[in-house]
Amino acid sequence: MILRRSGIFVAAVAFLMPIVAQAQDSPQRKELRRVDLSGAAGMEVISSISEFKPGDELPRHLHHGVEAGYVVQGAMVQNPGQPPSMLAAGAPILNLRDVAHGGFKVIGPGNLILFTVHTVDKGKPLYDWVK
């Protein structure tokens, strides 16, 4: 009986693990590929595309590693207390380890599309949200 209950518990935990991992992610992000970084134990490289519609917000956050990428499709964005500014197509993205960034709202006119590559600590959440 104890073995059966243990098996049910393990199955329930395994089922819920993806839900917990997704709760730490951005709903606008679609992961394209994830691989271990050769020659650097404990590091991985993750490529993603994120699409934000007008009205979507990207909360302030940081990563446990470096984020690089570019703006595929630009849009106007607004940081709290700041006038709107353009994130232009082709603009580079480079955010250093543990440095908070983001915190803007997309105001349009179209969607903002970002391609990013994260080189981060394996096993840590990709995003840590910052208040």
Give residue spans per PLM region.
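A short, N-terminal "cap"/entry segment at the start of jelly-roll beta-barrel domains
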Residues: 2-46, 93-96, 126-131
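Glycine- and acidic-residue-biased ligand/ion/polar-headgroup-sensing regions
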Residues: 64-82, 91
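Structural recognition of the beta-strand scaffold that forms the well-ordered cores
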Residues: 60, 69-70, 94-95, 113-116
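Extracytoplasmic low-complexity repetitive segments enriched in small/polar residues
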Residues: 35, 54, 77, 92, ...
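Short acidic-glycine-tyrosine-enriched beta hairpin
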Residues: 37, 52-53, 81-99
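Ligand-binding loop in jelly-roll beta-barrel domains
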Residues: 99-124
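N-terminal targeting signals for Sec/Tat export/insertion, comprising classic cleavable signal peptides
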Residues: 33-65, 107
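Short beta-strand His + acidic residue motifs that chelate non-heme Fe in jelly-roll/DSBH
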Residues: 60, 78-79, 95, 101-108
